């Protein structure tokens, strides 16, 4: 028996060297096309970070109504939408404006997403462009046959009315995407309360970027126990809310400590008990044992329902000697609460305040004055492109 083990280890080393040379090959046969789309200011910031840290096998696309912000962003493709609506000055916090501007550019977006197999849509919920554009982009990608994953952040409670917009935007995105992963900005107050505001937001950008990078490279880079696009498709088609877990440890008790680290992720606020699907990928050094890898996968999926579909893989990298990293996506979380508890509470409070104010206006006899919007529509601004399959004038409303 010892001879068999020794021979297997010798063969393993030879196979690893052969695999290494194959990885350097330029043969891209069968590789899925992954596109990461950032909509609005927060989404663009994530795209900029992704572009700079690099994601193997994925294209980055930035979409915005704000020309100045878009100029500052680095991406493989940049699209300024709704130029005739906003003059490149942004959506003014109005999701309907962001939605309209993106619909007018759907021909261009279809071209960019044409043969994509997996599309990530990242945005900040609660503003104008991201909230309105993300569901439109998700719908276009879905109609063209791609698996669509939304990766979004929610506003601070102090932003009040924006939490209501965020809730509505999340519901719209959930209706169009296969799965959505939600991160709550309020958790930054607990995680990095004393960082300068710019650096605090960059932490959220980095977490979203690293998550998208991790998922993308899990299915584009070879592994010892491989995960591929078909596995991703199977898990993401479970639908509902998805929960992302990331953990890393150098502790001797890798099996439990890496799971503890993932469970205590500071920016995730959704309970995934009863989820119907799980995708787990483990990265470790040459010292990672089969028992440890299986133990990690088992521990991190124990909260899933008994009949959950779990797919796991493992990759060995020399730089991970003595440590281990786990990334898991739990899908099919059948929770009506997409926002975190604190954000949901603020959204409910803000909605009640808005409804009360509208009720008072109705009782006082005041009516909504739509003359300005009507005048805009009559002047033709709202008619160029419309909801046509392809916008009528690319040069007018889309700048790439």
UniProtKB/Swiss-Prot annotation:
Disruption of the gene: reported phenotype: Viable, but have fewer colony-forming units compared to wild-type. Cells are very heterogeneously sized and misshapen, and have a notable amount of cellular debris. Loss of cell division. No effect on Z1 ring formation. FtsZ1/FtsZ2 double deletion mutant cells show various division defects, including fragmentation, budding, polar tubulation and fission resulting in DNA-containing particles, which are able to remain viable and propagate without regular cell division.
Keywords per UniProt: Cell cycle, Cell division, Cytoplasm, GTP-binding, Nucleotide-binding, Septation
Any one of the GO BP annotations: FtsZ-dependent cytokinesis
Family: Belongs to the FtsZ family.
GO molecular function, one term: GTPase activity
Domain of life (superkingdom): Archaea
Signal sequence range: none
Function per UniProt: Essential cell division protein that forms a contractile ring structure (Z ring) at the future cell division site. The regulation of the ring assembly controls the timing and the location of cell division. One of the functions of the FtsZ ring is to recruit other cell division proteins to the septum to produce a new cell wall between the dividing cells. Binds GTP and shows GTPase activity. Required for division ring constriction.
Places the protein is found: Cytoplasm
Biased composition (Basic and acidic residues): 1-16, 385-400
Ranges of compositional bias, category Polar residues: 365-382
Record's keyword annotation contains GTP-binding: yes
Chief location bin: cytoplasm
One Pfam family it belongs to: FtsZ_C
GO CC terms: cell division site; cytoplasm; cytoplasmic side of membrane
InterPro entries, sorted: Cell_div_FtsZ, Cell_div_FtsZ_CS, FtsZ/CetZ, FtsZ_C, Tub_FtsZ_C, Tubulin/FtsZ-like_C, Tubulin/FtsZ_2-layer-sand-dom, Tubulin/FtsZ_GTPase_sf
Annotated spans, Disordered: 1-30, 338-400
Compositional bias segments (type: Low complexity): 352-364
Quaternary context: Homodimer. Polymerizes to form a dynamic ring structure in a strictly GTP-dependent manner. Interacts directly with several other division proteins. Interacts with SepF.
HAMAP family referenced in this protein's UniProt entry, alphabetically: FtsZ
Name of the molecule in the record: Cell division protein FtsZ 2
Positions that bind GTP: 41-45, 128-130, 159, 162, 205
């Amino acid at each position: 028996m010892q001879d068999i083990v020794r021979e297997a280890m010798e063969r393993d080393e030879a196979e690893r060297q052969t695999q290494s040379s194959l990885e350097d090959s330029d043969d891209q046969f069968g590789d899925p096309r992954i596109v990461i789309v950032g909509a609005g200011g927060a989404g663009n910031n994530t795209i900029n970070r992704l572009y700079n840290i690099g994601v193997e096998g994925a294209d980055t696309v930035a979409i915005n109504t704000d020309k100045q912000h878009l100029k500052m962003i680095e991406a493989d493709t940049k699209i300024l939408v709704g130029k005739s609506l906003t003059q490149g000055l942004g959506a003014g916090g109005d999701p309907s404006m962001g939605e309209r501007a993106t619909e007018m550019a759907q021909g261009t977006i279809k071209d960019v997403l044409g043969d994509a197999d997996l599309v990530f849509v990242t945005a900040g919920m609660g503003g104008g462009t991201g909230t309105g554009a993300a569901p439109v982009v998700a719908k276009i990608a879905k109609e063209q046959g791609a698996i669509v994953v939304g990766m979004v952040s929610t506003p601070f409670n102090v932003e009040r009315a924006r939490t209501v917009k965020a809730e509505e935007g999340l519901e719209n995105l959930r209706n169009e995407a296969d799965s959505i992963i939600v991160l709550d900005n309020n958790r930054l107050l607990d995680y990095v309360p004393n960082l300068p505001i710019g650096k605090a937001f960059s932490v959220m950008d980095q977490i979203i970027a690293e998550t998208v990078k991790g998922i993308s490279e899990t299915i584009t880079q070879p592994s010892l126990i491989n995960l591929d696009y078909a596995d991703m498709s199977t898990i993401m088609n479970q639908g509902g809310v998805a929960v992302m877990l990331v953990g890393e440890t150098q502790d001797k008790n890798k099996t439990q400590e890496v799971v503890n680290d993932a469970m205590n992720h500071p920016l995730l606020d959704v309970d995934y008990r009863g989820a119907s699907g799980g995708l787990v990928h483990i990265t470790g050094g040459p010292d990672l044992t089969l028992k440890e890898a299986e133990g990690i996968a088992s521990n991190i999926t124990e909260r899933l329902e008994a009949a959950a579909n779990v797919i796991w893989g493992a990759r060995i990298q020399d730089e991970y000697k003595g440590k281990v990293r786990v990334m898991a996506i739990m899908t099919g979380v059948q929770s009506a609460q997409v926002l975190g508890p604190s954000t949901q509470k603020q959204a409910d409070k803000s909605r009640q305040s808005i409804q009360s104010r509208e009720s008072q206006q109705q009782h006082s006899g005041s009516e909504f004055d739509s003359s300005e919007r009507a005048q805009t529509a009559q002047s033709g601004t709202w008619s160029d492109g419309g909801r046509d399959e392809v916008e009528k004038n690319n040069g007018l409303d889309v700048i790439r």
